Amino acid sequence: MIRNIALIFFLLILSACSKQSGEDEQHKGYYYTGSLFDPYIAQGSIFTREVKNMPLATNSAAIAAYMPKMPAEYLPERFKKTVLTTLSTTSYNIPIYVVDSNNPSQEYANFESKDNRVIYKKDLVQYTTGRIPLPKYAQPAGGGDKSFAVYDRATGIMREYFYAVKDEKGTWHFAASGYFKAKPNFKDLGKDNFTMQHTTGGSAVVCMLNPLSQIGIAEARKGEICHALSFTIANAGKGFSYPAKQGDGTSTNPNAPLEGQWFRIDPNIDLNKLKLRPFTLLVAKAVQKYGGYAADKNLFCHTFTAEHPINEMVQGKPNPWEKGGDIYEKYNGIDLNDFPWHLTQWAPVDWGK
């Protein structure tokens, strides 16, 4: 009798272990646990071009002097003297969902649009509407843009959506989209798409693969960002600059840079001597080496964007950007308000085209 009880107990344990193993395998099928930022998938693109020999626009110094002053023209009175530069981690950034349409466990969703920005472009209808691989937990970033990206490892199709809203039946309705068709697993992405532009359309105004110029979670943990960074500018000048494909700036100030216009921090400055906050120093070093560009405007302040933490949080992990999260604690905060805009240098419009 004792042997029978022991056998039953053993079988119950074995069954539980098998069930847990199956759940783990299913979990892996739904959730991509790797990183697009380490190793960086856009190596060899314009995002990893070093800028030490970047030429300067004739009004570069004037732009640098204006950048710290610009937000005060748009901020509410209570923020004018205290807010200059922020970091978006869960709102107004672009979550990236890496999917695998070859995986039998991959979930899908239907996508529809009635917006003229989509329906009159045959390839956008072909590549960004219909049945698209997407995990059920997917959601857009908070804030008004409601954007997210879906990158399919199997096909190499990189889809991005703007103002995506899911109805009660699970169908996503969106206002704008963009795509680029890379090789499977995004092999040679930097070689095949040096400019990091969408083939057609876009989720951000510059119509680029903007999510890959966000600050990656893996990079922040590692302590080094190895690519250029995009930011949302308080306002931009009218027009746009390569590699952007369009812009929506409304500023008439001659020293408001254009969206897409490249900038850097003076390479002759020793950033370690500036007494910047640790996280600001991380960002400043990336901008000094690889540069950056304005990808959108917000009529508020200057805002860098970070990789959205949803893919980690759905696995039960804490938000690394929040107080108590590992990145926040590593840098003793992620405040970027001391970013040295006055030390930036700006390239001529369309530099590198």
Q: What positions do the PLM features span?
A:
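Sec-dependent signal peptide recognition
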Residues: 2-8
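C-terminal motif of bacterial Sec signal peptides marking the signal peptidase cleavage site
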Residues: 13-16
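Bacterial signal peptide processing site
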Residues: 18-20
